[in-house]
Structures are given as C-alpha cells and as structure tokens.
C-alpha cells in the first residue's frame, strides 16, 4: 500500500456503508447475509482508523428512513445490532475505543436501548478513537432536534436569541464537540449524501468508491485517505 503522510491524516472520517444487499444478491444470498459480512468490514475499518491515527470514525449503519424496508429485514438488522454490541464492545474497550450511538435511540426496543447505554458507559473514557455508529439517524432530524433544544433553552431563560450562532448550534447536534467531518466516503458507486451529517460535512472532501461495503478493506480505506491527501482544501477561500 502507498504510505500515508502522517501529518495530513483526517481527524474525522464518515462512511456511508452502502452495498450490503447488492453484495449478497450477487452471491445468490439473502440481504441479511450481506449485512452480516458488512460487520466484518466494520471491524477492519475501525482497526485501520485506529492504526493510522484518525480521531473520529462515524459509520452510517441505519438511517431513520430504513424503517421503510421490509419488516423481516428490519427485524434481522435489529437482531444483528444486538449481537454486534454483545460481541464487539469488550474488544472496543480493550483497544481504548470510545463508542457513541448517534440517533434517536428511543425508536429501538428497551433491551437494545439498555445495551447501547451499557456500551457507551463502558467505553466513555477511552481515547484512542471515537467510533460513532449512526443508527436511526438522519441529518435533518439532527438539525431539528438541535433547534428544539436551543428553543427550549430560550424558553427557559437559559439562552438569549442573540447568543445563538453556528458554534452554539453545532454544540447542540449529536456530534457535540467533535471535529467537523474532513472526509466523507460512500461505497457501492452511488453518489448521494442520503441525509447523513448534513451540517457536519459542510467542508468535507467527498470520496466515492465503486466497491460494495463488505469488500471495503484496509487497502480501499488507504486509497481513500491517499485521495484526500492529494486534495487542496480551501474552506471557501480562493486558490493561492
């Protein structure tokens, strides 16, 4: 693999993990087979991110629109989520990785909410990498919940309208004090944002990979970082 510039590693990488279903269909399998193999790709992505010094990795696991999928698939995804929490959290903790679940967790079963709380509590003081799993998440929902939170603070006299600015709103998003996204990766060849981290990707570099998510490995991730390092980020400014 091409070596990375250690002085130009993106702090925050977000990934839209797309293509599990198509990967399974290409192999004549049920869609859930693709999701299960997608978990293996998650493990490899997390390991790579920690190894190269990425500080925050956000993975889009289940959007608020995914509830519209067939009930059988949704139920299988919820069971897989529970299983992954059981199997992976201790490994994350051992590797000093902090886990956050971003999204409206009240939409999940009480047992899943309890597992989420336990996992976040166990890993809350870890510092090597912050792993955000966006589940029952949508970028529009995130901005709306932040706006409601600020409106409630104004109503209670804790915040003046004139004090609301971009920084204050950003702190009210589910990502809170985390850095803005530097690099957004989407797999499977699709070139859409799909309501993901709409505020947080304002100045992100976009990288679209034709590889289906279960086949997205360390080599593919490395190529995405290389592409990022070859770009000149202007943040709205002019070319020098």
Curated annotation (Swiss-Prot):
Which keywords annotate this record?
Cell shape, Cell wall biogenesis/degradation, Magnesium, Metal-binding, Peptidoglycan synthesis, Transferase
Question: Which prosthetic group or cofactor does it need?
Answer: Mg(2+)
Give the catalytic activity. Answer: 8 isopentenyl diphosphate + (2E,6E)-farnesyl diphosphate = di-trans,octa-cis-undecaprenyl diphosphate + 8 diphosphate
Q: Where is the active site?
A: 18, 66 (proton acceptor)
Q: Which Gene3D superfamilies match?
A: Decaprenyl diphosphate synthase-like
One GO cellular component assignment for this chain's record is:
cytosol
Q: Key word Cell wall biogenesis/degradation present in the record?
A: yes
Locate the residues binding Mg(2+).
18, 205
- Give the cofactor binding note: Binds 2 magnesium ions per subunit.
Q: Under which EC number(s) is this enzyme classified? A: 2.5.1.31
CDD domains, per database record: Cis_IPPS (cd00475)
SUPFAM superfamilies xrefs: Undecaprenyl diphosphate synthase
Pfam families per UniProt: Prenyltransf
Q: Which residues bind substrate?
A: 19-23, 31, 35, 63-65, 67, 69, 186, 192-194
As for family, the record states: Belongs to the UPP synthase family.
Q: Which NCBIfam families match?
A: PRK14830.1, uppS
Query: Its biological function?
Result: Catalyzes the sequential condensation of isopentenyl diphosphate (IPP) with (2E,6E)-farnesyl diphosphate (E,E-FPP) to yield (2Z,6Z,10Z,14Z,18Z,22Z,26Z,30Z,34E,38E)-undecaprenyl diphosphate (di-trans,octa-cis-UPP). UPP is the precursor of glycosyl carrier lipid in the biosynthesis of bacterial cell wall polysaccharide components such as peptidoglycan and lipopolysaccharide.
Outline the subunit composition: Homodimer.
Question: Could you tell me what this protein is called?
Answer: Ditrans,polycis-undecaprenyl-diphosphate synthase ((2E,6E)-farnesyl-diphosphate specific)
| Species name | Pasteurella multocida (strain Pm70)
